[in-house]
């Protein structure tokens, strides 16, 4: 009996996805999911309504290039998959008790640590290098990494990948 090429491809893909999740975990990511770049067909309409209603407030940058923002393929035409990763960046200790001490100022938690953009981007680049190295065996890979710094709708993509949900009245 001859092996079905689709079954072989599915097995290779499954093995790669599992290896990817393990590599992401080694980099400190708590969760790793993959979705299709066209998994958020409602995004352009929802983004347009959000902008038309002025919900973006003073964030004028959100209104620039809404088509690129709403669909990953508009931002990068060669995109085939979107890997969505999550990392808990919370402090080890609960900062809320500090707020009860009214006689002293409190520095916001995010300002006490290294900029998460830098921390996470370094880890993403390490993971991207791992992916490229793995692909040398089979087929070439090109990877783009973003840490909420590109016009990508992270929330709908995360929901499409199975990382929670997005509320009706959120951007």
For each of these PLM feature ranges, what is it?
Residues 1-171:
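Auxiliary alpha/beta "docking" domains used to position bulky ligands
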